[in-house]
Swiss-Prot record:
NCBIfam families: PRK02929.1. InterPro entries: Ara_Isoase_C (IPR024664), AraA_central (IPR055390), AraA_N (IPR055389), AraA_N_sf (IPR038583), Fuc/Ara_isomerase_C (IPR004216), Fucose_isomerase_N/cen_sf (IPR009015), Lara_isomerase (IPR003762). Pathway: Carbohydrate degradation; L-arabinose degradation via L-ribulose; D-xylulose 5-phosphate from L-arabinose (bacterial route): step 1/3. HAMAP family: Arabinose_Isome. Pfam families: AraA_central, AraA_N, Arabinose_Iso_C. GO terms for molecular function: L-arabinose isomerase activity; manganese ion binding. Keywords: Arabinose catabolism, Carbohydrate metabolism, Isomerase, Manganese, Metal-binding. Catalyzes the conversion of L-arabinose to L-ribulose. The gene is araA. The keyword Manganese applies. Its cofactor is Mn(2+). This is L-arabinose isomerase.
Length: 500
């Protein structure tokens, strides 16, 4: 399980010695109260830790270096309670290697109109102190998040929580290892990409393995462990008749359990948290992994089909960002359309949709698979939960990585789907199918996505800014004309600024 409470964001307040010890004591007192208040809110997924008020360039530099080396620190929240000359922040911000959020707030919500004096004015200077700090961030061309409002307002707290989830995803990516069993599906373009640049830009590493390495782990699984896992299947899911104890295809369920055990051991021993496979490279396997992949995703692993390592890493990052939230997150594919009444997307895949998005108890079934040349694979079948969701992809467009996001609304299937033997989700894309699909195609978005009913576009946008990658959002405000222009402008911007 993914526990975000092991992570910290440090609450860092800037000031200067000009104001004297009494004022600085009040600055520290207020800052400690704000940090504690944010830490106690349910919207904050990580710990908020107060740090001593910074009043010198050396103190700023030391704290930023300390943050870089602190394993559990995922970023800073900065606030200038008083005026803090920004030149003293330059060395520290140049050294800082973790994301930071600039909280533009003040301790008091209202002005004490009848009693306000210069003591109050000299203490509560964020209105201009934060502008000074904002200038140096812009002057240094630093990517950061700016949140404005009173620190106790729900909207402000929610923005901070969203950013913290993105920071947790970015922090996880710094150590993320993706295992690829086999290569890409042959001749497919969008699943390719520059793994060296991914390591430089997105931090994670991608390692390839022959399927035989996995097969050896699968064969090593004990019969006792297989029986125990099958018993868990029986307790958790509704087994179709062929997979029951006396069913004709019970052996396939045992094979599926053995595959899951082998995969788990391989990933755990290698400290991998995302993986890919491909139906074109199954030598030594009796079936394409189905239920094994689904259950691993439910436990927080990222997955990409047909060798799609970028989507595998993205799904893992989205899993981390979504930890502790209701609803689920999954690998997904835009599979087919319903083109009446504005259009619907039926999202699915051959097997590998995460049961965290299931609307009810999944059914464990076995059906033929016409590709791969192996036995019938076992999979979980269900309809998705409904409600607002996002689909997102990261593609390599040659000189940079691009994230494409589409806001969608998941609805129940218009009629039951008794003959469709895979998990599925039906959604209406924003603003509609025609515009969303056209813009997605113009942007070069992949057919594989990360799908989430609990994350928002803002989570993903915050992550993209931390990673320094292009981000294209398709929502109710999008038009094809504006999207094409945005893509042109982005292309010019990234060419002028260089491949980061």
């Amino acid at each position: 399980m993914i526990d975000l409470k092991k992570f910290e964001v440090w609450f860092v307040t800037g000031s200067q010695h000009l104001y004297g010890p009494e004022t600085l004591e009040k600055v520290a007192e207020h800052s400690r109260e704000i940090a504690g208040g944010l830490d106690a809110t349910p919207q904050m997924p990580v710990r908020v830790v107060f740090k001593p008020v910074l009043t010198t360039a050396d103190a700023v530099h030391e704290l930023c270096r300390e943050a870089n080396n602190a394993a559990h620190c995922i970023g800073l929240v900065t606030w200038m309670h008083t005026f803090s000359p920004a030149k003293m922040w330059i060395a520290g911000l140049k050294a800082l290697q973790k994301p930071f959020l600039h909280l533009h707030t003040q301790y008091n919500r209202e002005l004490p109109w009848a009693t306000i004096d210069m003591d109050f004015m000299n203490l509560n200077q964020a209105a201009h102190g934060d502008r000074e700090f904002g200038f140096i961030g812009s002057r240094m061309r630093l990517d950061r998040k700016v949140v404005v409002g009173f620190w106790q307002d729900l909207e402000v707290i929610s923005e901070l929580g969203t950013w913290a989830r993105a920071a947790a995803g970015w922090h996880d990516a710094q150590h993320l290892k993706v295992a690829r069993f086999g290569d890409n599906m042959r001749n497919v373009a969008v699943t390719e990409g520059d793994k060296v640049q991914a390591k430089i830009q997105l931090a994670y590493s991608v390692d390839g393995f022959g399927v035989g390495d996995l097969v050896a782990r699968i064969h090593a699984a004990s019969d006792r462990d297989v029986d125990h896992l099958v018993s868990e299947y029986e307790d958790t899911y509704t087994l179709s008749e062929p997979l029951t104890a006396k069913g004709k295809q019970r052996a396939s369920l045992l094979d599926a359990a053995r595959i899951e055990l082998g995969l788990r051991h391989f990933l755990k021993d290698g400290n991998f948290h995302a993986f890919t496979d491909t139906f074109e490279d199954l030598h030594g396997l009796n079936q394409l992994p189905g239920i094994a992949v689904q259950r691993l995703m439910a436990d927080g692993y990222g997955f990409g089909a047909e060798g799609d390592w970028k989507t595998a890493a993205l799904v893992r990052t989205m899993k981390v960002m979504a930890a502790g939230l209701d609803a689920g997150t999954s690998f997904m594919e835009d599979y087919t359309y319903h083109l009446e009444n504005g259009g619907l997307v039926l999202g699915a895949h051959m097997l590998e949709i995460c049961p965290s998005i299931a609307s009810g108890k999944p059914s464990c079934e076995i059906h033929p698979l016409s590709i791969g040349g192996k036995g019938d694979p076992v999979r979980l079948v269900f309809d998705s939960q409904t409600g607002p969701a996002v689909v997102a992809t990261i593609v390599d467009v040659g000189e940079r990585f691009r994230m494409v996001i589409n806001k969608v609304n998941v609805i129940p299937p218009e009629v039951p789907l008794p003959k469709l033997p895979v998990a599925r989700a039906v959604w209406i894309p924003e603003p509609n199918l025609a515009v969303a699909a056209a813009c997605w195609i113009y942007a070069g978005g992949a057919h594989h996505t990360g799908f989430s009913l609990c994350l928002t576009a803002q989570h993903l946008q915050d992550y993209a800014e931390m990673a320094g990658i292009e981000c294209v959002l398709i929502d109710n405000d999008t038009t094809v004309h504006a999207c094409k222009n945005e893509l042109r402008w982005n292309d010019a911007y990234y060419r002028l600024t260089g491949w980061r």
